[in-house]
Amino acid sequence: IQKEMTVMFADIRNFTTLVERMDPKHNVDFLNSYLSYMEPEILAAGGFVDSYLGDGIMALFDSAPASGGTTALACGATAALGMLRALRAFNANHSARAGLQLQIGVGLNRGLVTLGTIGGADRLKCGVIGDTVNVASRLEGLTKRYGVPVLLTGSTQRALTPELRSRTRFLDRVRVAGHVEPMYPLAGPHLPCRVHDSAGC
């Protein structure tokens, strides 16, 4: 089945290095506590967690227009900003005690995905595949390089409400899967757009 959705990848930056000082049980407890702050923001924005990838999250948002003609919730931008707010709360409540200050990167891409049952005979799960997924993953990886917490593709940026779209600026283009995608950082309150002047921010 093919469907238009927004795919989110979110990952803790340098997680392996950060938790080297912890024992395995504390690592798991710390990670589960962090995820308990992130997941509600995804659910509140109309998305759902497809999978946990170690310290990473893959989430999906139905991109069908919501009531009032907006797809902001479906695009996951609201979730991304909520996750950044939740991260500040997590850092204040937990990370300081552990001597850590977490940072995350979030990539969002809207487009067609293929949904199906994936796996071998002994382990099957519903999953999504396609270029849309690959581009979202690539954007998440580029957030560290460009020094921004959230990166969107042009198709995602165009689907935002005017208010959210006003928080974006064109940054660069990235070649993925044989085509070029524009990238836009998303800045929220207390989250200035921190990119090179040549990018127009």
List each model region and its residues.
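A conserved hydrophobic position in a structured secondary element of the catalytic/binding core
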Residues: A10, R110, L152
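Catalytic NTP-binding/metal-coordinating core of nucleotidyl cyclase/transferase enzymes
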Residues: I1-T78, C126
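Catalytic strand-loop-helix junctions within cyclic-nucleotide turnover domains
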Residues: L60-T71, V106-C126, T143-Y146
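Nucleotide phosphate-binding site architecture
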Residues: T16, M58-A59, T114-L115, Q157-R158
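Alpha-helical scaffold within the catalytic cores of cyclic-nucleotide enzymes
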Residues: N32-G47, S63-V106, D131-K144, R165-S166
